[in-house]
Amino acid sequence: LPMKFIVSSTGLFSHLQAISRVINSKNSLPILDCFLLELVDGTLSITASDSETTLATSIETTESDSNGRFAVNSKTILDALKEIPEQPLTFEVNDNLEIIVKYQNGKYSLMGQNADEYPQAANLGGNAVHVTLGAPVLMNGINRSLFATADDELRPVMNGIYFDIT
């Protein structure tokens, strides 16, 4: 597992922040308080989940020496990265899942978790549909229907917008 990679601090932070919204403070599995990071051929894939909803994103690394995967607590890494201005971050992960994040003015030491404990996202099967929409089209549709949504904890189904793709 020993691995090392270099990635942009603000690029990584914005990707982590975008998918962190799915992480619930009342998770049934402690591993779901973490981001799953998987490095394959220079691409860092990041996953966040609450077991019902899974969000994933990816970012290109500047440099990487091997493939690997680990989980890291979302709050810990977000709090560490939000204070760092744009610069390259060097991540070093050893066999004990100790993560050293080096930056210009110092380093952070974090404890990772075994990625094998992270639940796999459900396979969508053969009847999944892939749709590409421009951001303005999607935002226009959301803005036109947002008025009809509720903020009711007792009826969570009313809190969202239903997409019917046929």
List the predicted regions and their residue ranges.
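Structural preference for solvent-exposed beta-strand-turn elements
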Residues: 1-166
